[in-house]
Every structure is written in structure tokens, then in C-alpha cells.
Amino acid sequence: MYTKMAGCRYVVLLAALFGCTQAMSSVVITGTRVIYPAEKREVTVKINNEGIKPVLVQSWIDQGDMASTPSNSSAPFVITPPVSRIDPGKGQSMRVMFTGAALPADKESVFWLNVLEIPAKVVGNEDDNILQMAFRSRIKVFFRPANLSGTAAEAIEKLQWKLITKTSGQFALEAHNPTAFHVSQSNLALIAGSSRVASEAGMIGPGATQLFGLPDLKLLPTGAVEVEFSAINDYGALVPIRLPLKL
């Protein structure tokens, strides 16, 4: 993607930092998350160039900082190759290796895999005033220690939900995760009779308690109340869940 811009010479813009999505990128990561079992020496991540031009790809893992770069990230992983050229219609397998740093043994740890795509320079273009766009995709990496109690699939239904009133007077869903696994979810809503009140969704870490606001709920419901959401499993699939809710 190229745009005329006076006074600029091949400026690389990290468009992902400003809300651009993976769908805008030619490079597609196979899968929406990486599960790294602690007993494995390495795991493999496949990326594909679905565009019509060659691209240069740089990959690294961070600890959740969107502003991270390969030079300042302290995540305990090494990626091989860290930089590669991928031709149109081709793919690249990346080896992700844990360096052995001290991490909790009783719960998962979460990191982020970054894949930065830089399009090839236009050949034969005499105009130096070109803004060259680079796209960054990020997916979660879950480092999973051996011998954790339970499974990631079981953790989904073990979430403990409450409907609470915040000090501001607004209602919210409170979710407590008593397990050793992260639970990611979307399409979160409160179900009261025939009414459905949507809420923001997100990830709930091991042992964590998180609030999800219900700005459209004005009165405390009566009768049976449930919480509904789509949990995201290890394969990136959405699992529909409906659980009873404590008032």
C-alpha cells in the first residue's frame, strides 16, 4: 500500500499500533493463539503470505507491551528465524523456543507473538516521496506448565460469576477464575428472562477477578439470571457457554 507524501522517504509506519487488524495484512498467522507446553523443547508457528508481492517479516515475543520492539523485549523466548522473506503464496515455519527463565509452575503465563510485515520496496520507482506501510499482527502465547490441576477446557465452566453494584451505582458482571488457566471470552451478556444485556468481554487470568460493565442495565433483575458468553478454546474455536449467575 503506497501513498504520496512530500518530504518522506520510505517511512515505515507501524499501522497496527493505530488499530489496523490482521485482515489488512498479506501475512496471515495460522491459528489465533499459541499453546506452549513446558515439557516441549520448541513449538512451531506457521505464517503465510497471501498477498501478491514478496514481504519481509520480523517476529518477536513480548510480555504485553504494545510498544515493544525486538531490541527491548525481555520475554523468555527465542524465534528462529527472527527475520525472513516470504514470496507470494508461500509460507514460513517459525520455531519458538523457551529460554528456561523462571516462570510460575502452578499457573499459565501469557505472552504475545508479534509478526511485523514490511512490503518489498517498489523497484524502478523514481519517486522518493513514498509512505510504505508495515502491518503488525499479535496473538497470545500461553506458556503452560506440566501437571496443572484440571484442564483448559474445564476452566471455562469453572468461572464464578456474580452481578454486583459498583460504588458508582452502575451494575457489572464480576468473574472470578479459580483455575490455573487463562480464560478468553467474547459475546458476553447477562440473560434475565427474555432480556439480553450485552457487556464487554475479555481475558480472565488464573486466580484473577475481573469486572465487566453493564451500562445498559438500569434495574436489578428479578428471578433466574444467567451469564452467556463464547469461550475461546485452545484451537481458537468459540464454545457457547451459559452459566447461572449469583445476585
Regions found by a protein language model. Give the residues of each.
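Beta-sheet-dominated interaction scaffolds and their linkers
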Residues: 25-48, 151-168
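N-terminal targeting signals for Sec/Tat export/insertion, comprising classic cleavable signal peptides
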Residues: 32-70
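Short, solvent-exposed loop/turn segments enriched in Ser/Thr/Gly
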Residues: 38-44, 106-110, 169-171, 225
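Asparagine-centered strand-capping/turn motif at beta-strand->loop junctions
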Residues: 47-51, 173-179
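Short, hydrophobic/aromatic beta-strand segments
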Residues: 53-61, 182-188, 241
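Intrinsically disordered, low-complexity Pro/Gly/Ser/Thr-rich segments with frequent PxxP/GP/PP motifs
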Residues: 69-101, 194-221
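Terminal connector regions
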Residues: 99-148, 220-247
